[in-house]
Amino acid sequence: HKAYPMVNLQVQSAPSGELLEGLITGRLDAALVDGPLTLATLDGVPLCEERLLLICEADPPPVRGPQDVAGRSVFTFRRSCSYRARLEAWFSHDRVAMGRAIEIESYQGMLACVIAGSGVALMSESMLDSLPGKDSVSIHPLAEPFASATTWLMWRKGMLGANLNAWIDLQQEGKVLPDTETRAIA
């Protein structure tokens, strides 16, 4: 906001599915979502790569795969959350039934439940690193193809204006992903 004080930026947090719906219906101008996506009505650019971690109580047995946490409660966001879909796919990939999904509305709440030994959760390494209490859990990186997620900035085709372009430029100054053509994903 310091560089562009006249720009009115409103931020909203929601699962990727809900943000994409907001884009498609025109309620949102842009959204940060798990990608890449190939929707004919949207364009986007990758902003960052996130390492995904399964978090468990502090001293569990080793977690080598979903069979090691079968039947455990899973703390997650609503069904429209892309990380939840990834975790469900991780279980399905090895034909392991996922435990009961318990919907929690914050990462802090998920972490507290895991610290208490009530189940497991999936979150990005950067999110976990930002939370107090992160040292009270054990972390277990997922194997490919579930090990990482790329956060994309998405917008409706033809709606990339000067304000959004300037924001993209600011975000990409510290970017760690290889250069990608800004307008081509669909």
List each model region and its residues.
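A late-sequence structural motif
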Residues: 138-181
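Central regulatory/effector-binding core of bacterial HTH transcription factors
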Residues: 1-40, 104
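A ligand-binding cleft/hinge motif common to bilobed small-molecule-binding domains
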Residues: 35-42, 89, 108-137, 145
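Flexible hinge/capping segments at coil-to-helix
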Residues: 39-79, 165
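Secondary-structure junction motif
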Residues: 73-94, 161-169, 178-183
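Short secondary-structure boundary segments
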Residues: 35-36, 58, 125-127, 151, ...
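Hydrophobic residues within well-ordered alpha-helices
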Residues: 22-24, 69, 112-118, 153
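Residues embedded in well-ordered beta-strands
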Residues: 46, 53-55, 120, 138, ...
